[in-house]
C-alpha cells in the first residue's frame, strides 16, 4: 500500500478586522523605517535650493506622497533648519547629533492621519476582493491580483483625496471644526463637489497601474519562490524579496506618470496658494508633451534612482510586515479553535 502524499496544510483565514490591524501595524513600521530617507533628501534639497514662501514640495512617508507648502519665512520650519551637509550620510549623522534622532521623523505625524487609513483601506479591500474572486474564478486565476489591485487602489485614492486636500489647506493655520466646515462649504459652492478631488486624476493614473503590476508580480513571484524553496507557505524573506522586486518593476514602468503627477500637483497648489490664475491646459497629455518638448523622452524618466530608493524598501517592508501580522493572527486563530 502506497503512503499518502502530504498536501499543503489548510489555509487559516484571518478576519477583516485582523487584516486591518496587520495593515495598520505594517503602515506604521514602514513609515518609521522609510521617512528618514525622505527627510534627509528634503533637507539636502532645501540646503542647495532654499524653499521660498509658497513653494510646494513632496513629502513621502513611504505610504503616500503628500504636498507640503512652504509657509514660513523664518528658519523655524524643520525643512529650513541650517545644516551645512556634505552628502546623505553626513546629513544623517549631523541631524541626529545636532538636532536629536527625532528630527529624522520631522513632519511625519500629520501625514500619518491620511496615510495609515488609506493603507488599511487599500490592503483590506485587496484581501477581501481576492478572497471573493478566488471563490468565483478559482485559486490559480492569474487575473485576480490585477483586478483586485485596480479596484482596491481606485477606492482608497477616491476616499482619501478630499481629506488630503483639506490637510494641505490646513498647513498654514489651525482651524476649528466650524472654520473647517466653512472652508469646505465655500470650496464646494464656488467650484462644485468635484473640487474636493483636485489632484485625483494624476494620482489615479499613476497608482492604479502601479497597483495592478505590483500585486500581479508579487503574487506570482512569491508563488515561484515558494516552489523553488519547496515550501507551502512563504517566509518573511520570500515576502520581502517578492515585495522589493515587484515594487521596483512597477516603479520603473509607472515613472512617467509619477513625473507628470508631481509636476501637476505642485503647479496646482503653487497657483492656488499664490492666487495665480491656473494655466488653461493642465491635462496629463499636455504636461507630458511639454516635458518631452523641453527635455526629450528622457525627461519622463527623471528621478528614477530616487524613486527606486523610496519605493523598493517601502514595498518590501510594508508587505513583509503585513504578511508577518497576518501570520501572527492565523496562529492565534489556530490556537483558539
Swiss-Prot record:
Single Gene Ontology MF annotation: glutathione transmembrane transporter activity
Organism: Rattus norvegicus (Rat)
Main location per the UniProt record: mitochondrion
Cell location: Mitochondrion inner membrane
Lineage: Eukaryota, Metazoa, Chordata, Craniata, Vertebrata
A single BP term in Gene Ontology: erythrocyte development
Membrane topology of this protein: Multi-pass membrane protein
An example Gene Ontology CC term for this record: mitochondrial inner membrane
Name of this chain's protein: Mitochondrial glutathione transporter SLC25A40
Function statement: Probable mitochondrial transporter required for glutathione import into mitochondria. Glutathione, which plays key roles in oxidative metabolism, is produced exclusively in the cytosol and is imported in many organelles. Mitochondrial glutathione is required for the activity and stability of proteins containing iron-sulfur clusters, as well as erythropoiesis.
Positions in coiled-coil regions: none
Family: Belongs to the mitochondrial carrier (TC 2.A.29) family.
Tissue expression pattern: Widely expressed at low level.
Renumbered ranges of Solcar repeats: 14-132, 140-224, 234-328
Keywords: Membrane, Mitochondrion, Mitochondrion inner membrane, Repeat, Transmembrane, Transmembrane helix, Transport
Disulfide bonding pattern of the chain: none
Substrates-to-products reaction catalysed: glutathione(in) = glutathione(out)
Residues spanning the membrane: 20-40, 104-124, 146-166, 200-221, 240-260, 299-319
Keyword Cell membrane on entry: no
Top-level taxon: Eukaryota
Electron transport found in the keyword field: no
